[in-house]
Structures are given as structure tokens and as C-alpha cells.
From Swiss-Prot:
Record organism: Anopheles gambiae (African malaria mosquito)
Keywords, sorted A to Z: Cytoplasm, Initiation factor, Protein biosynthesis, RNA-binding
Name of the protein in question: Eukaryotic translation initiation factor 3 subunit D
Biased composition (Basic residues): 100-122
Localization: Cytoplasm
GO cellular component: eukaryotic 43S preinitiation complex; eukaryotic 48S preinitiation complex; eukaryotic translation initiation factor 3 complex
Biological process according to GO: cap-dependent translational initiation; formation of cytoplasmic translation initiation complex; translational initiation
Signal peptide: none
GO terms, molecular function: mRNA cap binding; translation initiation factor activity
Gene coding for it: eIF3-S7
Length: 584
């Protein structure tokens, strides 16, 4: 008899776990005993537990991206391998050079299978070792040059030089416009016709062709020419005052126009005062400024550094370059009472009745240009000499001088070694270091309508003596051809000038100032009070209560050291101050 088994199903129960309530934050309040005193360290299975010495790799690696793809796990020191030196196992190793067999004497033939020089498609001139490409020393050097860095400054480039503005901006000046160089470089005003002559003044001497045969082996000393150069601004020009009644509505000089047209190449700060009177613009330079001084190595990668009263400070180099240009432009002429001269219709307007001394050979050509939209520009341009051609016609010259001061400091080619054989390399170096100055000279020659632009190569007789110079050679160009060589676009130059004129024409009558920012590639237009820069008398400070600021923004005083001043006074041409200008 079988027993009946009754299976009564039991009811499933659920017991809720005991939860801890953390009043101070989140997470458990107590740590279980099983997990106490266990250190936590981020860990990844792909991490290496130690460092392996790779004796087949090269020491020259690309350190910049060494940690780009490295994992942050396993960064603790408990997993790293530390090698402890054991003095008992120390022994000397024979380091004598082993002569390789002939078939392994190539550059990378020791392990051609693993080391491949990257010269094919997609290669970058490196060496592939164990699947990792490392840059060679030459490739690293080329990379640094492309990035503009050097090892001298720790791969960060030289520290930026902070320059001061050419004039102190006062709080009551109102900024009207900021024009950055990339935007100005895109402007263009094509189809501007050749300037039309309104009046010609002055007397010119003829160029001495014997200076075309000067070379390094037949150098000539630069002589001191005691002549007066007039640097008259726009509103002080009696001819422009007369022409402003009948011709044009914008007035300037060739130097002022060239500064504005070539502003995108400039690094130093400069400023130009613009007066708007009755719908007419007068562009002026300020009195007692260094506007007329020539910059030296302004656009070089390492421009001259300020070093007190050193001969190679920016201000002293500018003074030296200016006097070299004055003396050179007069020495290469056929001067003398018996020598013929080329006279224009009117005499020099800046020679006063009580003026003592001989005036430099400079002729002035007053010209006008139609810039469309009712804008007519009237400007005073200059010629330096004339040249009689074999065909009988006369050509007008613009004469300038390039000066060498210290080729080692300037990182330039030494002229005495390369001028006769590699003149193109020297000129290319000058174009790189003095791009703004050469562009302004070219613009001035084009505005004046000069037939030739003649350059002289003048160097110091001794590197440490700025008082004696020698002429090493000359070179001439047609202004338009030279403009094409230096990538100077007159359409862009006219466009920059027209842009600034249009902005000023929209303003009310008053005084304005356009200034190149000393540390940024841009120019600013300010609305300034009418009495700014006015002076009660000669030698006094303006009503702003401060003396003029130097053009380059350095702290050098207006007077140089005693030896520099004495040296310059012995070799320089006489340059009168603004107070010596002839009155209208």
C-alpha cells in the first residue's frame, strides 16, 4: 500500500537588504573589512610594466609628440622598473672603432632592412626604426626653419620686442577706424593714370657716369658735401598753398604718400597729421620728429637692438643712413660753377633771401592725379639729378644709397666679398631686411615720374667707425621694373591711399591723426583736438605738455653720444631744421 505524499507549495519570500543612508554625501558609510587597506591605482592591461632598452633605435627622436598617444594609466611608480647600479658587475668595454667591410660603408647600410630613408611618396626625410619614424637632424632643422623657430630661444622663437608709439595717445583722442594690414593688402584701385604736371621748380645737376665703373677693387671714399636739404611739410609749402585755391582737394608730399602706400610693409611706428578744412585734406608730418630719417633693417628677422649710445642702435643707424644718402646723392653729380645745370621753369621755392650756403641739387615737380569720385590729389615730388643720354634726350634720376654697417651683427652677406660676383644675392638680402624703405623709394620714383632709380652701395671703412664710408658700387633700375621685382603693386598702393582718403572725407572739418600701431600690424585713425601739436614758439613743447616722441619708440635721446655726434658732423650734409624753411 503506497503512501500518498502531499506536496504543499511554499510561498516565495523576498527580504529587502539593509540600505545605508549617507547624510554627508553618497556611497556607503562604512567600508567592508574585505576591501580595507587595498591601494587603488588606475590600471590598463595594455600598459607596460617596465621600460625596455631599445639598443637598435636612434637617439634623435621627435620629442614634441612623444606623449601624444601615451596612456595615463599605470603612471604610478609602483609599476615602474628602477635599475640599481651594481658595482660588482662593472667592467670596461673596448670602444675602439671597428673597420666596416666595404659593402657596409654607406650611410644607412648597417641595417638597410629596418632603416629606410624616407624619400618616396609620403615620406618626410626620416628614418624608420622598428615601425616608428624618427626625424633626422637635417629634417628637424628644416622643420624649425619652416616654423620660424631656432634652438637659440628654446624652440619658442625670440621674445617679442615691445616698441613705443611714435606719439603718445591721449585720453581725449577718439578712435575712428582701425585698419589691419591683411584687409589693406586686399584693396585695389586700378587704372590710375599718370600724374599731370602742374608746376616744376628747382635746378638739377648732371650725373657723373664715372661712378658706374666703381667696384670693390676700385672703391671711392664718401665725401662730405656741405649742402642744404629742405624738408618742408605740406602746409608750409608756398606752392601748395597757392595751388590749393585752384587745383585738387587732397594735398601731400611724395614722402607722406609713400609712407601711407607702403604702410603694410612697415614695422616701426609712424604718424601723419591730417587737417580737413572746407572739404579739403592736408596731410602733414609733425615738426621736430624723425619722420625723414631712413630706417635700417626695419623688416629684418632680428632688427637692431637698442643699446644706449651704441653706433648700431636704431636711431644712430637711421642718422647714419640719412647722411649717407644726402652725401651720396650729391657726390655722384657733376658739381661746379662751370658745369652745366638743368633748370626748371620756376626757381627753388624754399630758398630765402637771407639763406646762406649752397642748396642741394633737388628739383620739385608738383603733380595731380584723378582718383575718381571727385577726389583730385596734388603732391610735391622730387628728382635728384638728370642724365644726358647718347640719343640726346634727358632722363630724370632718383638717387638713393644702401649702406652696410656690420654684416656679422646683421646676419648679412659681406659686401666686399660678394658685391662684384653676387650682387643679386646682396640686393635680395637688402629687400628682405629693408623691404619698407626700398618700397617707399620706388613709390617716390614712380610718383615723380623718374626714368631711372639708381642705388649706391656704401659701406663703412671700418666696422666700428661710423664716420668714414666708401662707395663700393652702383646699380640702376627702371622704377616700374623694380616695383615688379619687389612685388610692389601700385594698384594696391592707390587703393590704400583712397581708402584712408574716403574715411577722412566722411568726417567733419577738424584735425585727425593716422598712426601705425607700434606692436600690431594695423593703422589707426584718431580724431584729435585742433590745438594738438601746436607750439607757441620755437624750441618749446607743445600744448600737450610733452616733448615729441621718437619715431622708433626707443628711449634714445635726440642727441647721440659725443663721439657719434662728432663723427656724424664731420661727414654729414647740412640738413636744416623746420625753422629754416622759407616762408610763403
Amino acid at each position: 500500500m503506497s503512501d500518498t505524499i502531499s506536496c504543499t507549495p511554499e510561498t516565495a519570500t523576498f527580504e529587502a537588504p539593509q540600505l545605508q543612508f549617507n547624510e554627508d554625501g553618497w556611497g556607503p558609510c562604512e567600508l567592508p573589512d574585505a576591501f580595507k587597506d587595498i591601494p587603488y591605482q588606475p590600471f590598463s592591461k595594455s600598459d607596460r610594466l617596465g621600460k625596455i632598452s631599445d639598443w637598435t633605435g636612434t637617439a634623435q627622436t621627435d620629442k614634441k609628440f612623444s606623449n601624444k598617444y601615451a596612456s595615463q594609466f599605470g603612471g604610478g611608480s609602483q609599476y615602474a622598473y628602477f635599475h640599481e647600479e651594481d658595482e660588482t658587475t662593472f667592467h670596461l668595454v673596448d670602444s675602439a672603432r671597428i673597420q666596416k667591410p666595404p659593402h657596409q660603408r654607406g650611410r644607412f647600410r648597417g641595417n638597410m632592412r629596418n632603416n629606410r630613408s624616407g624619400r618616396g611618396r609620403g615620406a618626410r626625410g626620416g628614418v624608420q626604426v622598428g615601425g616608428m619614424t624618427t626625424l633626422s637632424k637635417s629634417a628637424n632643422k628644416m622643420r624649425d626653419q619652416r616654423r620660424g623657430t631656432t634652438r637659440k630661444w628654446g624652440m619658442r622663437g625670440p621674445p617679442p620686442k615691445i616698441r613705443d608709439a611714435s606719439v603718445t595717445v591721449r585720453p581725449d583722442w577718439v578712435t575712428i577706424e582701425e585698419m589691419d594690414f591683411p584687409r589693406l593688402a586686399k584693396l585695389s584701385l586700378p587704372s590710375v593714370k599718370e600724374g599731370e604736371d602742374i608746376m616744376t621748380c628747382g635746378t638739377l645737376e648732371y650725373y657723373d657716369k664715372t661712378y658706374d665703373r666703381v667696384n670693390v677693387k676700385n672703391e671711392r671714399p664718401l665725401q662730405s658735401v656741405d649742402r642744404i636739404f629742405h624738408t618742408v611739410t605740406t602746409t608750409d609749402d608756398p606752392i601748395i598753398r597757392q595751388l590749393s585755391k585752384t587745383h585738387g582737394n587732397v594735398y601731400a608730399t611724395d614722402a607722406i604718400l609713400a609712407t601711407i602706400m607702403c604702410c603694410t610693409r612697415s614695422n616701426y611706428s609712424w604718424d601723419i597729421v591730417i587737417d580737413k578744412i572746407g572739404g579739403k585734406l592736408f596731410m602733414d608730418k609733425r615738426d621736430n620728429t624723425e619722420f625723414d630719417l631712413l630706417t635700417v633693417n626695419e623688416t629684418a628677422s632680428e632688427p637692431p637692438q637698442e643699446d644706449g649710445n651704441s653706433l648700431n642702435s636704431p636711431r644712430n643707424l637711421a642718422i647714419e643712413a640719412t647722411f649717407i644718402n644726402h652725401n651720396f646723392s650729391q657726390q655722384v653729380l657733376k658739381s661746379g660753377e662751370k658745369e652745366p645745370k638743368y633748370k626748371f621753369q620756376q626757381p627753388n621755392p624754399f630758398i630765402g633771401d637771407d639763406e646762406d650756403g649752397e642748396v642741394a641739387s633737388v628739383a620739385y615737380r608738383y603733380r595731380k592725379w584723378d582718383l575718381n569720385n571727385g577726389i583730385t590729389l596734388v603732391a610735391r615730388c622730387e628728382h635728384d639729378a638728370v642724365l644726358k643720354m647718347p640719343q640726346g634726350d634727358t632722363q630724370f634720376l632718383t638717387i638713393k644709397a644702401l649702406n652696410e654697417w656690420d654684416s656679422k651683427i646683421a646676419n648679412a652677406v659681406e659686401w666686399r666679398q660678394k658685391l662684384d660676383t653676387q650682387r643679386g644675392a646682396i640686393l635680395a638680402n637688402e629687400l628682405r631686411n629693408n623691404s619698407c624703405k626700398l618700397a617707399k623709394w620706388t613709390v617716390q620714383a614712380l610718383l615723380a615720374g623718374s626714368d631711372q632709380l639708381k642705388f649706391g652701395y656704401v659701406s663703412r671703412a671700418h666696422v666700428r667707425d661710423s664716420s668714414k664710408h666708401v662707395i663700393l658700387g652702383t646699380q640702376q633700375f627702371k622704377p616700374q621694373e623694380f616695383a615688379n621685382q619687389i612685388n610692389l603693386s601700385m594698384d594696391n598702393a592707390w587703393g590704400i591711399l583712397r581708402c584712408i582718403i574716403d574715411i577722412c572725407m566722411k568726417q567733419k572739418d577738424g584735425k585727425y591723426l593716422i598712426m601705425k600701431d607700434p606692436n600690431k600690424p594695423m593703422v589707426r585713425l584718431y580724431d584729435i583736438p585742433d590745438n594738438t601739436f601746436d607750439s607757441d614758439g620755437e624750441g618749446e613743447e607743445g600744448d600737450d605738455g610733452e616733448a615729441f616722441q621718437p619715431m622708433y619708440g626707443y628711449s634714445a635721446a635726440a642727441s647721440t653720444s659725443a663721439n657719434v655726434t662728432a663723427a656724424q658732423s664731420n661727414t654729414s650734409a647740412t640738413v636744416p631744421d623746420q625753422s629754416e624753411k622759407a616762408s610763403a
